């Protein structure tokens, strides 16, 4: 299947470059780190093995020998989304660990693909007509029964899990998930400069996206630039009047309009 498995990895690179100003030396260091993992994987996983065995060995390497993991105590920190931090500490969240795992799998020609599941990123393995699902949190296989429990927990009791929810992710939806997680983390940590730079890049490619403009308004409000923030909020309310966020912002808009601060 022709699928851009490294799209998520590339977005992590872009996130790092946009928000922290990745230098040439940083890029070379990251290339060396990920290249080393690929070389080790190629050495440790014999090409003569069947595909299922190769996938199993890759998971053992990634989560066992290399020690990639998720820490529930620091799950939503932005450091879990920065490629340099994840490669250095071997700690991330499902979307970032999954991005690195998919990148390596692509280099090894292994049939692993992302699933944009409601609760988190899930990895889908397709081998000779069989399908299995892997939790990028810890590399364990996930049963259909457990996936159904996750789905009910997210969508409501009695909701039916359909093949659509388990299909290979649309790249645009996948990148959208990463971008929202990244924005949320930066805004929550009040890393306003980084958040503003990242959102500005996203708006450059989608200048009329009301959700990106809303998020820019949230950052501007945190920076004290209320006058400019209200313009973004008003645009979002006009474009998405039925969105629950629009109703909340509408109630706060008049209060914000009373404060006018210049951008500085």
Curated annotation (Swiss-Prot):
Q: Which domain of life is it from?
A: Bacteria
Q: Which species does the entry assign this protein to? A: Pasteurella multocida (strain Pm70)
Please give the family membership noted in the entry: Belongs to the UPF0162 family.
**InterPro entries xref list:** SirB1_N, TPR-like_helical_dom_sf
The record's listing under PANTHER family reads:
F-BOX ONLY PROTEIN 21 (PTHR31350:SF21), SI:DKEY-261L7.2 (PTHR31350)
The protein, known as: UPF0162 protein PM0557
């Amino acid at each position: 299947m022709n699928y851009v498995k490294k799209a998520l990895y590339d977005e992590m690179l872009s996130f790092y470059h946009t928000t922290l100003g990745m230098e040439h030396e940083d890029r070379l260091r990251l290339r060396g780190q990920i290249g080393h993992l690929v070389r080790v994987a190629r050495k440790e996983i014999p090409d003569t093995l069947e595909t299922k065995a190769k996938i199993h060995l890759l998971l053992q390497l990634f989560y066992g020998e290399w020690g990639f993991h998720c820490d529930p105590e620091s799950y939503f920190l932005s450091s879990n989304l920065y490629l340099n931090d994840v490669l250095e500490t071997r700690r991330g969240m499902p979307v970032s660990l999954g991005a690195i795992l998919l990148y390596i799998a692509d280099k090894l020609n292994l049939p692993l693909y992302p699933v944009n599941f409601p609760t988190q990123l899930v990895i889908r393995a397709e081998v000779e007509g069989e399908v299995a699902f892997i939790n990028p949190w810890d590399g364990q296989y996930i049963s259909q029964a457990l996936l159904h429990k996750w789905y009910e927990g997210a969508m409501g009791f009695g909701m039916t899990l359909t093949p659509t929810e388990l299909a290979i992710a649309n790249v645009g939806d996948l990148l959208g998930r990463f971008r929202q997680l990244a924005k949320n983390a930066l805004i929550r940590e009040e890393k306003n400069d980084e958040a503003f730079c990242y959102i500005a890049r996203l708006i450059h490619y989608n200048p009329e996206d009301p959700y990106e403009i809303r998020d820019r308004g949230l950052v501007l409000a945190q920076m004290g630039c209320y006058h400019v923030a209200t313009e973004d909020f008003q645009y979002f309310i006009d474009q998405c009047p039925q969105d629950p966020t629009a109703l909340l912002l509408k109630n706060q808009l008049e209060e914000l309009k009373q404060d006018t601060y210049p951008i500085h």
